[in-house]
């Protein structure tokens, strides 16, 4: 090597090492293990830095295509692999979906989510779903859809329709994932989320707890979410609803305090995200739901049916917020 080559070699810019994760699993476990009052105090402090602590966004979720899904998710009543007595239905007509959205708005919801039980949508499905998105947005509602895995061109088409959020949950930690589903890999989920992000759509991504996972595995889910760059704008936390006919029908109920802890840890690790109380909320009494709000939850799914599981009645939800001195708010009004 010549002197010039040697000089050139020694002055080359070294390749940067990959950035360290913002949250190690051990750090998330340490949050979980804080005394309950200390954890909630820290979560509430974080929450108040970014949001109006007494404002809750009300969301409604409609199943626009029910049952017959090719996936084998162990928790899901809509899987064709499980005998849950759920009849598979075709994609709803656009007018029927828009009628449901109008009802949701009349009942106080400001966010309307549409879910389809597919492994992935066919291209022929995208156009009617774009019509639904446009129609719901014309009502002044925030839009979210969950349709399974997406190809790049499908994500772009949804973005062109003005979709606000795309939901695609990780479900659980990478380590526990194989015990819940075998028909779709963890990387498949991450790839869809990347396509959604690249299309310019806000990411809605969370998981389900109470499926038999350990606290470490719950922490693994939160760390995975919090270390996304950027982390999701919307993080739904689901409490398993054990449905007869699914592999998890006999799952042991999660300690409600562990659910509250998970909400608090999600708030601390993803301070600017909307943390949403999702499926399984009916398993929490009013006092536990109030603790979830204290822990930093600032959205809840609202209405009588959440996909194919029950959800507290809308009137009961309104009364609960009134008793707590809290109020329903537009998404744009939630920030402090």
Curated annotation (Swiss-Prot):
Enzyme Commission number(s) from the entry: 2.8.1.6
Database matches in PANTHER family: BIOTIN SYNTHASE, BIOTIN SYNTHASE, MITOCHONDRIAL
Protein's name in the database: Biotin synthase
InterPro entries for the chain: Aldolase_TIM, BATS_dom, Biotin_synth/BioAB, Biotin_synthase, Elp3/MiaA/NifB-like_rSAM, rSAM
Family named by the database record: Belongs to the radical SAM superfamily. Biotin synthase family.
Catalytic activity: (4R,5S)-dethiobiotin + (sulfur carrier)-SH + 2 reduced [2Fe-2S]-[ferredoxin] + 2 S-adenosyl-L-methionine = (sulfur carrier)-H + biotin + 2 5'-deoxyadenosine + 2 L-methionine + 2 oxidized [2Fe-2S]-[ferredoxin]
Cofactor(s) it depends on: [4Fe-4S] cluster; [2Fe-2S] cluster
